């Protein structure tokens, strides 16, 4: 059993890799962006003149929501995250990213590393986050039992 899953209701990965992989009680979430299933991006607006405006706060919030959706598919939640790595195209966006991050996590949340990268797989992306969660098998089975009872 590989434990790897591509989640149909989310944006398809832009390569041959899963959204998530479960190994024992650990859940590994691949780098996740603000991309929607229809291949548009949260946090991208084009004005009437054709100028593209990118919003780090909206993208950060959407990335974290996408990670929450991925974790939910394997019986986890954001509070199960133990480590995240955030990739920013520009450290000039750190303040806006950090502001949204702090709405959801505090010093008791996951450990975090934030790095600047040259670019991400699409020019509209300002941020991508990967993570590791600890979701004991007993919690995952309880979640599956609840879903099956519905």
Which residue stretches match the model-derived regions?
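N-terminal presequence-like segments and the immediate start of the first folded domain
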Residues: 1-65, 69-82, 88-150
């Amino acid at each position: 059993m590989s434990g790897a899953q591509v989640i149909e209701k989310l944006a398809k990965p832009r390569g041959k890799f899963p959204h998530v992989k479960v190994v024992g009680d650990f859940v590994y979430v691949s780098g996740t962006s603000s991309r929607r299933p229809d291949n548009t991006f949260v946090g991208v607006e084009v004005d009437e003149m054709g100028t593209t405006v990118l919003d780090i706060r909206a993208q950060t919030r959407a990335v974290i929501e996408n990670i929450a959706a991925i974790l939910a598919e394997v019986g986890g939640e954001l509070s199960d995250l133990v480590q995240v790595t955030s990739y920013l195209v520009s450290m000039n966006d750190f303040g806006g990213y950090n502001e949204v991050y702090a709405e959801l996590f505090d010093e008791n949340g996951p450990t975090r590393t934030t790095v600047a990268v040259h670019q991400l797989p699409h020019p509209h992306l300002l941020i991508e986050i990967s993570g590791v969660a600890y979701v004991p098998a007993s919690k995952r089975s309880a979640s599956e039992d609840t879903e099956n009872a519905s």
